[in-house]
């Protein structure tokens, strides 16, 4: 869950949903909070975290504490830690893997996650409507539980984002953004 942000919790199940089930490292904190919730239904929780950021491919991690921290400091794309970063630090975020395919990658059927999508990416309706019929701006994104920490089964596909666009101004037919960064950030 988020770090350095006050979160209201009204039940033990909501506590587990927002901050994860207890494990060997968190059970003593979780059980105190759960005990409080047996007698009341209005607990305010603030998660603390160390500054250790070690779950990266290149060794240069970035600690993003919560949505506000991301929006205020990183939403402009100034991170230099890679293409993707988990919304919250910890074991759950460390288990996430992101895989994507663009129209330019010719072997859609050979992509490990092609079965999660109806068809290969191509040119979006938005680009076509602008006369860019060969823009090939679409991509598919799969978010995977690589270690099985979230789902219990390694390599489980958790989320898919089909036919999102690489064009920053791309819109869906309902007028909402279809730009892949905005879609993933708002829906994941």
Per-region residue spans from a language model:
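Surface-exposed assembly/interface segments
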Residues: 1-188
